[in-house]
UniProtKB/Swiss-Prot annotation:
<dbReference type="InterPro" id="IPR036322">
    <property type="entry name" value="WD40_repeat_dom_sf"/>
</dbReference>
<dbReference type="InterPro" id="IPR020472">
    <property type="entry name" value="G-protein_beta_WD-40_rep"/>
</dbReference>
<keyword id="KW-0853">WD repeat</keyword>
<dbReference type="InterPro" id="IPR051959">
    <property type="entry name" value="PAK1-Kinase_Regulator"/>
</dbReference>
<dbReference type="GO" id="GO:0004860">
    <property type="term" value="F:protein kinase inhibitor activity"/>
</dbReference>
<dbReference type="GO" id="GO:0009968">
    <property type="term" value="P:negative regulation of signal transduction"/>
</dbReference>
<feature type="compositionally biased region" description="Basic and acidic residues">
    <location>
        <begin position="325"/>
        <end position="351"/>
    </location>
</feature>
<feature type="repeat" description="WD 2">
    <location>
        <begin position="80"/>
        <end position="118"/>
    </location>
</feature>
<dbReference type="InterPro" id="IPR001680">
    <property type="entry name" value="WD40_rpt"/>
</dbReference>
<dbReference type="GO" id="GO:0000463">
    <property type="term" value="P:maturation of LSU-rRNA from tricistronic rRNA transcript (SSU-rRNA, 5.8S rRNA, LSU-rRNA)"/>
</dbReference>
<feature type="repeat" description="WD 1">
    <location>
        <begin position="40"/>
        <end position="77"/>
    </location>
</feature>
<protein>
    <recommendedName>
        <fullName>p21-activated protein kinase-interacting protein 1</fullName>
    </recommendedName>
</protein>
<dbReference type="GO" id="GO:1901796">
    <property type="term" value="P:regulation of signal transduction by p53 class mediator"/>
</dbReference>
<feature type="repeat" description="WD 5">
    <location>
        <begin position="243"/>
        <end position="284"/>
    </location>
</feature>
<feature type="region of interest" description="Disordered">
    <location>
        <begin position="309"/>
        <end position="392"/>
    </location>
</feature>
<dbReference type="GO" id="GO:0005730">
    <property type="term" value="C:nucleolus"/>
</dbReference>
<dbReference type="Pfam" id="PF00400">
    <property type="entry name" value="WD40"/>
</dbReference>
Amino acid sequence: MEVVAGCYEQVLFGFAVHPEPVGDGHRERWAPVADFTHHAHTASLSAVAVNSRFVVTGSKDETIHIYDMKKKVDHGALMHHNGTITCLKFHGNRHLISGAEDGLICVWDARRWECLKSIRAHKGHVTFLSIHPSGRLALSVGTDKTLRTWNLVEGRSAFIKNIKQSAHIVEWSPKGEKYVVVILNRIDVYQLDTASVSGTITNERRVSSVTFLSESVLTVAGDEEVVRFFDCDSLTCLSEFKAHENRVKDMFSFETPEHHVLVTASSDGFIKMWKLKQDKKVSPSLLCEINTNARLTCLGVWLDRRTDTKESPPAAAEPAPVSKEQSRRNKEESGHAVQEEEKQPKPDTEKCSLTGDSNKPTRGNSLVSAKKRKTVEMLEKKRKKKKIRMMQ
């Protein structure tokens, strides 16, 4: 496995982690080894996502950078957004969804690296998005104070809910039966069947990251050193532990055959991996820690898996041809308010706008090599300087 982390210093770190042999009476420990540092962007990194082959990073430089973890090479950059990349999510190995401060949500073919669809999702910034485990739905929140549900089968808005405040995190549970929406230090728990708030969890500080460990247990980190475990049914805090000496910026969790592992990154520059006990009331044990000496912003873990069946899109979300009329209708409907939540459509392989393939890449949607990207950036800077001199 490989821990990857982005920082304000424009660098992506990679650390290979291997379990150490455990002797009798000794605590389990993992050994991290520095694998690579990649100066991927010209501004601070803001988001990272991983699948079984690639690591992608988003930045304030408005680009999405791709790194091939199998070959350990720079795979180029995606240039479509006109704003800071705020969120990146893979669904399996075929699709990447990105959100940015330009209000757009883009769906990318993660094989040919082409933009399949671009949606005007929010009137303000897109602050976060989350994909349902089935691949049929997605949720997004933005600075326009709305929570939006997207039908990924037909490629259009399904429901818009005004939430009166700007949420900065939304996250589905592992089975997709509930989801949470985070506003400052408040976590609202929603049930999918009712689309209404079933309860509210209040954290002591502003929440910076959440991750579900199970359908009912939610891990919460905020602008403090402490990580807490909450029960989403009883809305109570099961336990808490001090993870860092400074605020926790991001978290990532995954399962091994033996136990759950929680990875935390802090603005103190440390990345820590924790072994979680089955009883969440018992404090976790530290597996390893990594000092990056950087101001960390985002975190991910690349697991070297040959197959990714658990996250594969369902048959209804597989790419299929889209008629011109259907495409035009989807574009008109995307981003418009829907007064009532629509009934979920039956799976139809003939309709798949968001995850449909495009044989003709449009301008600005295809993969850009690292060399070409740097040339474009240099020309853009010269153009801006020339414009300033002409104005003077």
